[in-house]
């Protein structure tokens, strides 16, 4: 309640600052700081009864600023890009938060992204594919990142359920059979947290099944590969080649070109999955493919180590592409951004390579990947009847 009162007070003060003739004069920076404080208040990974009002108040306050004041918005997390960055048309998305679900639901759970175009192409793309494959089931959406949910809600007025909200919606609508399909890559921390939430609601349904994440079981070490990893490896390689003039990876290698697929990385034991994907690429004969991660977990996937590996292998041209379901902030900024710590910049600044190109596309927009999610959903459904 204190945060809500503070936000409403900031909004009231701001409207007085910029909205009424004869109001006490304040600096542009003070007006911007008031909005930054409101943005920081909703940049949190927890939802409260105050969240909806805080999101609405932050947007109203932002809209009341002049263009010059908007450029001055800076906080612990706040920046002009929070409301000002154009990431595409949110109206093309479907939050899939409607009631009238029926008795059979597929809940597609994603981390989420505030990039509208990517959300439509990648997350909605997967959801649409699953809905088309199972027309007798209702597909609904949940995001695990409340920070992203709040961002999209405040900026675009799009309301997306978090996992607990989505599960409660299913209960309230009388769902009897529930299949949960995570779009996460692996059995990592996000998957573990999802399982905790699902288990807390499990006794509310007649039957519940949780499908495999994209890359399937983790395995014990870097040598463990499986059909899911092979399918994803083939899919991303095919998609990457399609955006070049090369017909095959062998052609690219002969021309001195390497492909670096950048994942997120994790300190979770599941980080071995990235090492397994490198093993999978090598097993398929894609020796000019290198797996990296933003977080540098596992260690060999850190940017500087990947640069060293690509250089040692003798490649002079590099294509960077995200190994992520969504091409959101990490793809646009950590990978392809112009900042000094982006992967593109670090590869260029190494002075080793003749060219560094970026492909910004998520796994979710690749048809073969969508089909793999459909297969995982079907496998989970099959367990309901056993």
Region locations from a protein language model:
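Positively charged n-region of N-terminal signal peptides that target proteins for export
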Residues: 1-4
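Beta-rich interaction/scaffold domains
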Residues: 24-91
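Hydrophobic helical h-region of N-terminal Sec-dependent signal peptides
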Residues: 9-14
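Sec-dependent signal peptide cleavage junction
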Residues: 15-27
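Extended amphipathic ligand-handling, pore-lining, and cofactor/metal-binding catalytic surfaces
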Residues: 26-29, 81-319, 324-386
């Amino acid at each position: 309640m204190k945060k809500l009162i503070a936000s409403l007070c900031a909004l009231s003060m701001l409207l007085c600052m910029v909205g009424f003739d004869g109001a006490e004069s304040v600096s542009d920076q003070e007006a911007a700081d008031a909005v930054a404080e409101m943005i920081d208040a909703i940049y949190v990974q927890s939802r409260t009864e105050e969240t909806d009002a805080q999101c609405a108040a932050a947007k109203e306050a932002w809209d009341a600023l002049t263009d010059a004041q908007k450029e001055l918005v800076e906080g612990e997390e706040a920046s002009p890009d929070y409301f000002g960055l154009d990431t595409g048309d949110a109206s093309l998305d479907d939050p899939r938060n409607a009631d009238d679900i029926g008795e059979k639901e597929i809940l597609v759970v994603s981390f989420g992204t505030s990039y509208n175009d990517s959300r439509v192409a990648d997350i909605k793309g997967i959801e649409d594919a699953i809905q088309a494959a199972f027309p007798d089931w209702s597909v609904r959406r949940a995001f695990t990142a409340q920070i992203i949910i709040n961002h999209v809600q405040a900026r675009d007025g799009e309301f997306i359920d978090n996992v607990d909200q989505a599960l409660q919606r299913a209960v309230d609508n009388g769902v009897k059979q529930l299949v949960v399909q995570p779009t996460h890559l692996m059995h990592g921390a996000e998957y573990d947290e999802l399982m905790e939430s699902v288990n807390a609601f499990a006794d509310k349904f007649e039957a519940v099944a949780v499908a495999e994440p994209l890359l399937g079981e983790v395995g014990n070490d870097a040598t463990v590969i499986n059909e899911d990893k092979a399918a994803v490896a083939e899919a991303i390689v095919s998609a990457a080649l399609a955006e070049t003039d090369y017909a095959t990876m062998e052609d690219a290698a002969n021309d001195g070109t390497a492909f670096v697929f950048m994942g997120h990385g994790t300190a979770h034991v599941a980080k071995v999955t990235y090492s397994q994907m490198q093993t999978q690429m090598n097993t398929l004969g894609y020796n000019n493919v290198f797996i990296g991660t933003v977080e540098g977990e596992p260690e060999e996937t850190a940017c500087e180590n990947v640069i060293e590996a690509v250089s040692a292998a003798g490649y002079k041209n590099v294509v960077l592409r995200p190994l992520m379901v969504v091409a959101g902030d990490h793809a646009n900024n950590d990978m392809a951004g112009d900042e000094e710590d982006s992967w593109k910049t670090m590869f260029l600044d190494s002075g080793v390579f003749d060219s560094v190109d970026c492909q910004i596309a998520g796994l979710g927009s690749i048809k073969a990947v969508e089909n793999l999610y459909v297969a995982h959903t079907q496998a989970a459904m099959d367990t309901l009847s056993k």
